[in-house]
């Protein structure tokens, strides 16, 4: 009997060692997302996994498509895999040909304690296909969906979207606004939670001290905007506002950081409207902070956001923020504009907000001081600890009735 016990014990130890990858009793975590491009959510994921406790978590990041600019910033201990080396045109439609379970079997080859879809849409559909009762599933929602049709765009139907999201043990939203929006559209079996984005605050402050010779002293108030050059960021209306301000004789210069499909269109608009001397397009920058820190005002012109990483970073370096009313901004800047100026989500309102700050330097100076105060609330340690506690609690809970 003792020999039989020893045999079972040794086999059990071997199985346990294989499962934990010979790295002790660590929690194996998978983060899956579309790619590691220049978007805010992608940058936030890198910040998060790089700062998680490597003695407790064995982390793998899988992207459906490779080639993203944020891949280079993953620390060496983070396992990184891509399903496809480059983006495949029409991939969302192609993936709908397969069920979530089939996609999961194709894309996820190992066993994990917790699997996280770090963006809504295709990533959530894949992770919802996990069939292991011993694996905790988390869906991370970064942006407002507004309608059930929009939330279901990457799914075969609205019914499939509802079924998939309700397979997750936990849904995490990046702001209260996103949480209210998502829960009004997707009826979850349990309440979602809010966890704020992780930013590298100390590193950002240090990098912001670097020289930025492109930012010139031309007697203009310097505006800065950062983001992918796509429709949702609203840079088209920001450029129209710049034309209007110049026509009115306002001395203002916009520095636009980012790359994307609308770059050529924006450059053409600047030339046609004689904004060459008032708009500088700097493309994608690995260190945007040095530019933001040397400008007088950060502008978020977006039609929609989750919890703006770029606006958060502006506050961290002490640059005042004016923004359209998108999700997370009231939480970030205060219900009554205590820490920055939030306008209605329209071109006219944003124009009036920028003009107000240009016409009242004392108000701009006030928000510069308030930005420095608010920027101190964004702590890398606190946001990472909150995520780690959620993961550990979920992992423990998988041993009880919370199993799917």
Please give the residue ranges for each predicted region.
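A short, active-site helix/loop in glycosyltransferases that binds the activated sugar's phosphate group
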Residues: 125-127, 166-192, 199-203
């Amino acid at each position: 009997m003792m020999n039989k016990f020893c045999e079972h014990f040794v086999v059990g130890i071997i199985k346990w060692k294989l499962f934990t990858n010979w790295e002790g009793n660590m929690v194996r975590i998978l983060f899956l997302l579309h790619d590691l491009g220049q978007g805010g959510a992608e940058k936030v994921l890198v910040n998060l996994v790089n700062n998680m406790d490597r003695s407790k978590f064995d982390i793998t990041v899988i992207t459906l498509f490779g080639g993203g600019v944020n891949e280079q910033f993953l620390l060496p201990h983070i396992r990184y895999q891509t399903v496809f080396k480059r983006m495949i045109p029409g991939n969302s439609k192609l993936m709908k040909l397969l069920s979530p379970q089939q996609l999961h079997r194709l894309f996820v080859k190992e066993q994990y304690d917790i699997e996280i879809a770090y963006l809504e849409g295709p990533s959530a559909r894949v992770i919802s296909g996990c069939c292991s009762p011993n694996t905790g599933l988390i869906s991370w929602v970064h942006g407002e969906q507004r309608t059930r049709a929009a939330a279901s765009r990457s799914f075969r139907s609205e019914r499939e979207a509802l079924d998939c999201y309700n397979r997750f043990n936990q849904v995490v939203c990046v702001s209260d606004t996103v949480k209210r929006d998502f829960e009004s559209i997707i009826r979850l079996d349990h309440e979602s939670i809010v966890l704020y984005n992780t930013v590298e605050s100390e590193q950002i402050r240090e990098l912001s001290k670097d020289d930025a010779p492109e930012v010139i002293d031309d007697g203009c108030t310097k505006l800065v905007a950062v983001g992918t050059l796509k429709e949702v960021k609203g840079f088209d209306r920001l450029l129209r506002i710049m034309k209007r301000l110049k026509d009115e004789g306002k001395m203002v210069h916009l520095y636009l950081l980012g790359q994307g499909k609308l770059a050529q269109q924006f450059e053409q608009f600047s030339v046609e409207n004689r904004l060459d001397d008032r708009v500088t397009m700097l493309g994608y920058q690995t260190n945007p902070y040095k530019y933001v820190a040397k400008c007088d005002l950060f502008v978020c012109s977006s039609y929609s956001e989750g919890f703006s990483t770029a606006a958060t970073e502006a506050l961290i370096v002490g640059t005042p923020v004016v923004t359209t009313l998108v999700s997370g901004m009231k939480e970030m800047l205060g219900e009554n504009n205590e820490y920055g100026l939030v306008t209605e989500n329209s071109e006219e309102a944003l124009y009036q907000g920028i003009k107000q700050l240009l016409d009242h330097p004392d108000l701009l100076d006030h928000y510069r001081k308030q930005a420095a105060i608010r920027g101190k609330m964004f702590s890398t340690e606190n946001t990472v600890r909150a995520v780690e506690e959620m993961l550990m609690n979920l992992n423990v809970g998988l041993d009880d009735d919370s199993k799917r």
